[in-house]
Amino acid sequence: NDTRALPDFAKNVLDGNDIVLLSDGSPTRTFCYITDAVIGYYKVLINGIKGDYYNIGIDTPEISIKRLAEITIDHAKELFNYKGELVFGESSDVDYLTDNPNRRCPNITKAKNMIGYSPNIDVYDGVKRSLIWYSENYEEECEE
């Protein structure tokens, strides 16, 4: 339980547990696949202006955490015959949602224009790839 949505969802799936949201799932996010991020960081190193800053991420689609859970479940059913469901609960931590913004979406215009950054892997494919990776590396990750 590292409190990041996709890793927690993947753990729930691989353990055969329901995915539990500790909110209504309405906050929105964009989700950048790791290879796109690494390519972006590389482009900053090679093409970026020293001392300048660049937002690396993905700007579309912006989806709710609930939708991310639904996408995860859909892929998990296809890949692993997952039987779990999306359920809603509450955190015992009264401050759980205190610093949780309703929206996170980077403006990557500068990175696109100045260093040629262009993320390619959408959230649907990224979630599927991530679930496959987690399933292949699950035991090793649990040992750490």
Protein language model features and the residues they cover:
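Flexible, glycine-rich beta-alpha linker
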Residues: 1-5, 27-28
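C-terminal substrate-binding subdomain of Rossmann-fold SDR/epimerase-dehydratase oxidoreductases
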Residues: 11-144
